[in-house]
C-alpha cells in the first residue's frame, strides 16, 4: 500500500475521531521505541501507525488502554520561576506601599474635609464641570 487513505483505516475503526486518537497514540508508542509490525518504507511514525491500523497488524485493545492511561496521567507541575513568584500575592503588601491603619486613614480624611469649606468644594465642582451646568 503506497498511500494510506482514511477509507482504508475506516474499515478497521469506523469512528474517525477514534481513528485519529488511536493512530496518534500508536505514533507516540512508535517514537518511544515500540516495535513496528510492517515495513517502514522510509515513512514517518504517523504514516506507519495508519498503515498498521489499515492492515490490522496492531492490537487495538492495547492501544485503547495506552490511550486511556496517557490521558488520565496528570502532568507534573512546573516549578514557578522568580518572575511568577513576584506576582503571587503574599502577606506583605504587594504594591510596596506602607500599610495604613483605619485610624490613620480616618484622621487623614477628617483633616482633608476640615481644610475644605463648602465654597471650596463648590468651586472645585464648578472647575471640574467646566463652569457649566451638569448635563443630564
Curated annotation (Swiss-Prot):
Disulfide bridge map: none
GO cellular component, one term: DNA-directed RNA polymerase complex
Record text on subunit structure and interactions: The RNAP catalytic core consists of 2 alpha, 1 beta, 1 beta' and 1 omega subunit. When a sigma factor is associated with the core the holoenzyme is formed, which can initiate transcription.
Biological process, per Gene Ontology: DNA-templated transcription
Enzyme Commission code: 2.7.7.6
Catalytic activity, reaction form: RNA(n) + a ribonucleoside 5'-triphosphate = RNA(n+1) + diphosphate
Species classification: Bacteria, Pseudomonadati, Pseudomonadota, Alphaproteobacteria, Acetobacterales
InterPro entries, per database record: DNA-dir_RNA_pol_omega, Pol_omega/Rpo6/RPB6, RPB6/omega-like_sf
Function text: Promotes RNA polymerase assembly. Latches the N- and C-terminal regions of the beta' subunit thereby facilitating its interaction with the beta and alpha subunits.
Descriptive protein name: DNA-directed RNA polymerase subunit omega
Amino acid at each position: 500500500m503506497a498511500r494510506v487513505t482514511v477509507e482504508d483505516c475506516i474499515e478497521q475503526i469506523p469512528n474517525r475521531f477514534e481513528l485519529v486518537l488511536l493512530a496518534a497514540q500508536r505514533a507516540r508508542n512508535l517514537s518511544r521505541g515500540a516495535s513496528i509490525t510492517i515495513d517502514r518504507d522510509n515513512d514517518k511514525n504517523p504514516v506507519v501507525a495508519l498503515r498498521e491500523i489499515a492492515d490490522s497488524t496492531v492490537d487495538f485493545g492495547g492501544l485503547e488502554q495506552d490511550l486511556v492511561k496517557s490521558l488520565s496521567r496528570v502532568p507534573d507541575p512546573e516549578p514557578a520561576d522568580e518572575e511568577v513568584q513576584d506576582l503571587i500575592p503574599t502577606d506583605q503588601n504587594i504594591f510596596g506601599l506602607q500599610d495604613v491603619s483605619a485610624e490613620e486613614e480616618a484622621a487623614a480624611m477628617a483633616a482633608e474635609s476640615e481644610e475644605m469649606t463648602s465654597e471650596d468644594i463648590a468651586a472645585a465642582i464648578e472647575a471640574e464641570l467646566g463652569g457649566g451646568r451638569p448635563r443630564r
